[in-house]
Amino acid sequence: MVKCKLFFWLISWFLKVKNGEKVWKFLKSCPENCYSEPQFAFIGRSNVGKSTLINALANKKIAKTSTKPGRTQLLNFYKNESEKLFVDLPGYGYAAVSKTKKHQIDRIIAGYFQKDQPISAVFLILDARVGFTNLDYIMIEYIIQQGFKLHILANKIDKTNQSTRAILLNQCKKLKLNCLLISAKNKNNLSKLQELLE
């Protein structure tokens, strides 16, 4: 009976992959990097939609989301159907957490972005309605100083107008950074993001 269930599960998994359906899985949560494989890192201020983006890429809910900022407080690791590794980092800049918790999150982020980490690329996610904040600029400078490839993802563009989007792209141009306007909710431009993850 167990072998029969396993067989049908494998057939189902194969058909999903063949039909282009995303087969992602959650691995584990860690206070530090617990994998030595190359990985893509997602970081941003609290409540910019990092976990929602993971779910959109996976085409299913594998990352916990919340309207309350500060939900993610550890490094959350995922793998996609191509066995590529993704990391959802804690959000920075959430004022409502205690100083102790804030320092803990800062240590986790700083510890992750050490120069010897196997990071293929970092994707810094913004809330397109808010744009760049001082904390974002600090994080951008830090990541670049550490020598990692950096992309900007301006999320929630479905809630912005053309003028706001133009301003964001101009700011990215001044920073000499690749910027992609996306909506994790409506899946706008996720195919372009997938190309960056190849």
From Swiss-Prot:
Mg(2+) binds at S51, T72. Residues 36-198 form the EngB-type G domain. GO terms for cellular component: cytosol. The keyword Iron does not apply. InterPro entries: G_ENGB_dom, GTP-bd, GTP-bd_ribosome_bio_YsxC, P-loop_NTPase, Small_GTP-bd. Its cofactor is Mg(2+). GTP binds at residues 44-51, 70-74, 88-91, 155-158, 182-184. Keywords: Cell cycle, Cell division, GTP-binding, Magnesium, Metal-binding, Nucleotide-binding, Septation. GO terms for molecular function: GTP binding; metal ion binding. One of its GO terms (biological process) is division septum assembly. CDD domains: YihA_EngB. Belongs to the TRAFAC class TrmE-Era-EngA-EngB-Septin-like GTPase superfamily. EngB GTPase family. Necessary for normal cell division and for the maintenance of normal septation. NCBIfam families: GTPase_YsxC, small_GTP. This is Probable GTP-binding protein EngB.
